[in-house]
């Protein structure tokens, strides 16, 4: 009996203790957890075209990280994607959640606007949303064995030209615009008439000499550096970057060529979803600082700040018949007249396919 009483008391005490512990652990998990430390890191997703990759990775992103740390005490990291401008714009529209779109041409940003992802007026600042300029140039082999100086030099029957595909590369659209505009400029200078037929004619004659079409401007340059082709349509900044890297990459600036204006915009739907609007807005503003514009200039881009452009005027001469997209009617007209299904580019492409003179994609 004595042992029974002892065992009963022990069981009662054990039950009481278990109930006590159960009572202590009955609160919700969030009530038990220690308060979360305040976040000290921001992350931005940058979706850019291929050509400014070095400028961003080596100069601009590290500079902004240091600036943001000093200003806020917070660390900012970047997820980066670099593909052809058109492909990048389509990826963003299809679900790639870039916070910042840094592309080759305005029309690609407009795609993102039409998709409802950019909702603010991205062209409202003093530079109309453009962060860098460049011009279309012709790269050639060392020593210039073909004597290339201008567009007409690319039309000979024995010359092979490289150019990326306008369906995937913003750069290629600039090159098509440059050729059409240059033909019109020549007509205007020689005949006093801005003749679109002359622009189409020059485009056709040069495109007939295109041997390889890559997906992006960067891939096209890589193909050229493998020894394929006699000349390449490229960006001035791409050629200057190669020179900066110690490579022999001579080029000619045609007398009539187009001013390339490269846009940047934050993607409203994504920055709000990710909670990074403040740092994204600050990053876009940072791209217009003098130090950042100098960094772009170092890597071959023409700065949009006038005072920095003056510092680099010897490096970046202005060709005599430089024109902008406005000379061709602006991007809306260009999209309709040149790159739509019934536009000049597709029309020329169909003609070239019919005559079996269309260029082939690069071998991989």
PLM features: residue spans?
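Ligand-binding pocket segment of bilobal, Venus flytrap-like solute-binding proteins
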Residues: 186-254
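Periplasmic-binding protein-like
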Residues: 129-135, 199-207, 214, 245-277, ...
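Early extracytoplasmic/lumenal segment of secretory-pathway proteins
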Residues: 24-115, 122-125, 235, 364
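Bacterial N-terminal signal peptides
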Residues: 10-20
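Bacterial N-terminal signal peptides that target proteins for export
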Residues: 1-12
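A conserved helix-loop-strand patch within extracytoplasmic ligand-binding domains
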Residues: 113-185
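Extracytoplasmic
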Residues: 39-41, 73-75, 83, 87, ...
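Extracellular/periplasmic juxtamembrane helices and adjacent flexible linkers that interface
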Residues: 271-364
